[in-house]
Amino acid sequence: MLRFTLNGTQIEIEDGENRTLLEYLRNVKCMKGTKEACSTGHCGACSVLVDGRLTRSCVTLVRRLDGKAVETIENAPNDTMLQVIQHSFLDVGAVQCGFCTPGMVMATKALLLHYPA
């Protein structure tokens, strides 16, 4: 049995889980904020945090998450830092079409966690 947290909630799944974190988030948990674009880990639209580190969910297998903490854009209502980042993006018009914005918001949080102001 694999155990990890997803936005603060404990998750338990079978060890044989062979799907990517992106597939798990979108298809099992119905969390559509994390997007799929390149499917190779290059574009960043699928970015989430794993133990506070920026991670491309399209190339990360769920079976590698045992004991880890995963945070997605869906955690924004519970996370003041994500809320401030989202509002900052809106204030300067940094949303473009919005498709990859969740990944950019998560990347910004990772940057600020590792290089606080």
Kindly give the residue locations of the regions a language model identified.
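Signature of N-terminal electron-transfer/Fe-S-associated modules in redox systems
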Residues: 1-117
